[in-house]
């Protein structure tokens, strides 16, 4: 997170929300009729969902790069995917938020699969590798800058930012469920209070016997007890939901660390296997070179012996002719 004014940060999220509301009120634009199709396939799962074109996919990546920092700062990013869908509609591409999110996940999965592939093969198999790599590199630069400027909060921010990549697996916050529970408790208590008030007001004899002081004191005491009960129940639900959310987040973090360790182990094994293969190749080349040298030495020895014998025979013939 960059060190900008918190009021500007709040205003940025407010603009995104306002933009989404405006887009929901407008009629949807016509479908794009681009002819060039994305070789990676569409982000949807049904037959009626049109395939993603290359232009459409590039536009999605451009919008996702523009909002990447906001995605990393927001745990509940369902609203942000609505903003992405609205921006896609502005460009003439009609896609739902779920389709955009699914397409992004598929692209990230293919990007990770290309990390051990040769560069030439990457360009042929996955044409959007450079765009996604640019997004992740910009994210890493922001994290490094943030760690350099605010070291005291870097570790906490690191956990929060990396949790969004696994890419976009959301863990629901407890606030919404807690608020719904609190509203339910308030409505229930309100109905019970209305029933008690109605039953008391419909009996004039009982109302006449009670004094105003006693009635007001009882009402204040009942209201105080009700508010206390609601607050206590709210606190219990808050603690419970926060614990459940924390446990779920810790489980996902443990799973992520396991996957990362497994990936590193496999990469180390592949590197060792590659080094062993290279050593075996070098040993075979050395053996072949030694065999070639031995054969060359034998050939030279045979040639020398043959030449010496021919010279001796020639000298003997010449000597015999002299006699």
From Swiss-Prot:
Biased amino acid composition, Basic residues: 1-20
Location(s), subcellular: Nucleus
GO annotation (BP), single: regulation of DNA-templated transcription
Top-rank taxon, per record: Eukaryota
Region (Disordered): 1-51, 147-176, 190-220, 269-297
Start-end of Acidic residues biased regions: 164-176
Keyword Hydrolase found: no
Gene name in the database record: GT-3A
CDD domains to which the protein is assigned, alphabetical: GT1
Subunit structure comment from the entry: Homodimer. Heterodimer with GT-3B.
Role description: Probable transcription factor that binds specifically to the core DNA sequence 5'-GTTAC-3'.
Cited Gene3D superfamilies: Homeodomain-like
Expression sites (tissue/organ): Predominantly expressed in roots and flower buds.
Name of protein: Trihelix transcription factor GT-3a
GO cellular component: nucleus
